[in-house]
Design a protein with these regions (language model features):
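N-terminal signal peptide c-region/cleavage motif recognized by signal peptidases
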Residues: 14-16
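Acidic/histidine-rich alpha-helical segments that form the ligand environment
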Residues: 40, 95-130, 137-153
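Bacterial N-terminal signal peptides that target proteins for export
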Residues: 1-8
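Short, contiguous alpha-helical
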Residues: 30-41, 51-91, 130-178
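A short alpha-helix/helix-coil micro-patch that ends at or immediately precedes a cysteine
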Residues: 44-45
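Short, flexible helix-adjacent loops and helix caps
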Residues: 48-52, 82, 118, 122-125
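Boundary of Sec targeting at the N-terminus
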Residues: 20-23
Length: 178
């Protein structure tokens, strides 16, 4: 009898841990999205308004071009395809928009990525979704493409910051020590 009570108590204690581990991939994606949203928005916001046209070479995207790409071709499109949540109506931005407008649009696009993935489960990752053009792929592949796009453009922005004598957000000293 006593052994049964201990077994029941142990099982009940394990339930929250099991429930939390039911969507490890989707949960990891949400964590990466939060992290990248913070770093990318902070990186763009670090540039003075007069530097939004900066690009190291004529062939590369400017800071404003990166921000517009992430808003218009990146976050709304990719997060919608990855999660199945339709893109919301939003004011279009282009490279002539003010720094404030570009940062606000970027933040809003990441807010959409965050909210659209809130109910995403690992069970949905094998679902077939529209990719680019007529192609289909899995929801998981679209999530990976989205994360890859964030990583690519954060690296680009971090390099632009360093080339302008600034330390990117991910290299900033952490508050409170380590």
């Amino acid at each position: 009898m006593r052994a049964s009570a201990y077994a029941l108590a142990a099982a009940l204690c394990a339930v929250p841990a099991l429930a939390a581990a039911q969507n490890p991939v989707s949960d990891a994606y949400r964590g990466i999205e939060d992290h990248q949203a913070h770093n990318i928005v902070a990186a763009v916001d670090m540039f003075p308004a007069g530097k939004f046209g900066y690009r190291p070479t004529p062939e590369q995207m400017s800071v404003a071009m990166v921000a517009v790409h992430l808003v218009e071709e990146g976050n709304y499109f990719l997060c919608s395809r990855a999660t199945g949540v339709p893109e919301p109506q939003h004011a279009k931005v282009d490279t002539t928009a003010s720094k404030e407008a570009l940062v606000a649009a970027l933040r809003a696009s990441f807010d959409f990525c965050h909210s659209s993935a809130a109910n995403l489960t690992d069970a949905q990752l094998a679902d077939s979704v529209q990719s680019f053009g007529p192609r289909k792929t899995t929801r998981a592949a679209m999530l990976l493409i989205t994360v890859g796009d964030w990583e690519d453009h954060y690296s680009q922005l971090a390099n632009y910051l360093r080339l302008n004598g600034m330390l990117p957000p991910s290299a900033q000293p952490r508050r409170g020590g380590m």
